[in-house]
């Protein structure tokens, strides 16, 4: 093989990435039309299609490379030269960071995730950090309130590319101004101007306007979820201006945004200012670049593990029957390994568990299911594993371990955001915090069900609490589609003795679920039971679940809000929410600074 072959292979990989990202942008660009046409099922299909594109194009490139090399063996020096040639193609390449991740994916597919060394892969980027200061097209546009905030917001909304009429633009502008005045006060608002992203961020049934409230000493998020009414008219549902609210909107438990980003790195840097608590991995994940987010997540792990003296330990909480979960005490992620053998009541295979995790990756997570990154042949230093955990790994997942002396290799694991297990949280809180947690738990189940997901095992231990107090589901081995479940009432006992029998007096088929039985484990705690009955008693009735099933089967797609319903303009300013009525801010026109 000649030296020219290395360049040909490098060019083939980069061209394959160009094709993949071109299709990625093509699918993304259809988001506006899907929104305008209210084609919500197409929204869901496009989300899955875009996720599958990456692996599909990696496979195409792998087949091309096998043809190019004609099945000849490739030694280490040859592979290093290919990477060197690829590196030389990247200095002027606009998406170099994701192109490196694509190279890694091709290599892993070719060599079955083995020999994953920094010499052969882009474990760390080969390129210096690039500030995106000169762009072929600006990412955002500035708006100044010289003629008042009403005029400014009118210009912002009129500049949107959406081709639908507004339900009542003047009313929505009044709502936004009132919300800004409540959040900032008139004097501070008078010192602000807006910077608004040129592209809308589409997700579920909303088109998000994402911007920045730029003040002399700080910058805040400015987020407007724009919805489409059943009559085909646009309206703004709320205005979010805090970092915590923005963090939830861009959260790890939500589906990826559809936002047209030819330069994703530049968009990530632009977003960082209003999402200071998000890591680089989380920002790439939010805009749909999930494979590069995996690369960045691994880099964040390496950065942490090389600078700490902690040891891996079993994660807090009740030990799972399917997954073995461990963590580093100060790290914000957990590592999940499928056990070799499951508890007897778990009649499933490892392949089934992996399929469930893939379902979650592709499905609308509605802010209630944690995203995961999947890794193969993950290497750990033994000195950084607590002896008790190492013994547990060897006992429970020994078939997935390869002992390399001072290191072990785990053939397959998931990395997921670390949360406080809900059962531990409920033990620690009282009063309003307890009430909020129970309300969140029930809301999580409702929203999952509305998205056609039945959690299966709804024990508190299978849910976690985020730093924002949201309850998120994270145990996926028993999930299924709502439409696959048969929700039944428990038949009345035939005789008084039936209720005392160890076996049910009625037949139970696969897929049967009896919501009345939820009460036994959800309401057993006297601190929790009355709260659950007060707020979520309908979850204990089979007819509630069947009604949801019917809505799903009839094609209804529920609205998903990344904020509390009490923040919706229709709730906050409900008396003035009629389409034919404009809204006047409480304090009238905002004063302009001199």
Swiss-Prot record:
Residues engaged in binding ATP: 315-321, 336
Record localization: Cytoplasm
Database matches in InterPro entries: AceK_kinase, AceK_regulatory, Isocitrate_DH_AceK
Entry's EC annotation: 2.7.11.5, 3.1.3.-
GO BP annotation list: glucose metabolic process; glyoxylate cycle; tricarboxylic acid cycle
Record key words, sorted: ATP-binding, Cytoplasm, Glyoxylate bypass, Hydrolase, Kinase, Nucleotide-binding, Protein phosphatase, Serine/threonine-protein kinase, Transferase, Tricarboxylic acid cycle
Reaction(s) catalysed (UniProt annotation): L-seryl-[isocitrate dehydrogenase] + ATP = O-phospho-L-seryl-[isocitrate dehydrogenase] + ADP + H(+)
Entries under Pfam families matching the protein: AceK_kinase (PF06315), AceK_regulatory (PF20423)
One MF annotation (Gene Ontology) recorded for this entry: [isocitrate dehydrogenase (NADP+)] kinase activity
Catalytic residue list: 371
Main location (coarse class): cytoplasm
GO cellular component, one term: cytoplasm
Entry similarity comment: Belongs to the AceK family.
PANTHER family found in the cross-reference section: ISOCITRATE DEHYDROGENASE KINASE_PHOSPHATASE, PTHR39559
Function: Bifunctional enzyme which can phosphorylate or dephosphorylate isocitrate dehydrogenase (IDH) on a specific serine residue. This is a regulatory mechanism which enables bacteria to bypass the Krebs cycle via the glyoxylate shunt in response to the source of carbon. When bacteria are grown on glucose, IDH is fully active and unphosphorylated, but when grown on acetate or ethanol, the activity of IDH declines drastically concomitant with its phosphorylation.
Classification via NCBIfam families: PRK02946.1
Protein name from the UniProt record: Isocitrate dehydrogenase kinase/phosphatase
Taxonomic classification: Bacteria, Pseudomonadati, Pseudomonadota, Gammaproteobacteria, Enterobacterales
Gene name of the encoded protein: aceK
